[in-house]
Amino acid sequence: GEDYAVFLESLGSCADEHSVSLIAYCLMPNHVHLLVRDGDDELGEMMRSLLSGYAQSYNKRTGHVGHVFQQRFKSCPVESDEYLLQLVRYIHENPAKAGICKAEEYWWSSYHEYVAGSGRVDTKLVLSMVGGVSGFKRFSKAAVDRRVGGVFSRLSDSEAHETAVRELDGLLPSELKAL
């Protein structure tokens, strides 16, 4: 728990320092998922600062020597509203997918920031797309309904869009964002 708290504190500081907005996150025992808005193309610098700073802190705190992270971070652009929604849901469902607990029971993801409205994550965009907190809860629950035998199936962009439209009573996500 302490390591996760230190990592989140560092993440918030580094994101602020590099003008990167956090959209969603989930800290897992062996990996981290981040969804960010990087308007100034600072993601690489932010990640370098975050990972090296956290590694130094971790090594000092624990007496560990050497690398803390196994590999360089991977990133990909998000080019549609549908994919954005799919990623937010995928990130928050990681603990359930790993058999740890339900998304709403896991304290090391941004799920609670969407529901409670506090924290380091910029929730405005996603909440506007899904109809606020109640829409977010319904949209998140739809991911649980897709589990079959404990295994998640990944949504295609069109499936994510169809799910969003169904959960939003026929409104398009892009229409909600424009409200």
Spans of features found by a protein language model:
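Short Pro-Cys-Gly-centered "Cys-loop" motif that presents a nucleophilic cysteine in a tight turn
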Residues: 1-24, 37-179
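Short Gly/Ser/Thr- and Asp/Glu-enriched loop/turn motifs at secondary-structure junctions
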Residues: 27-31
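Short beta-strand motif characteristic of blades in beta-propeller domains
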Residues: 32-36
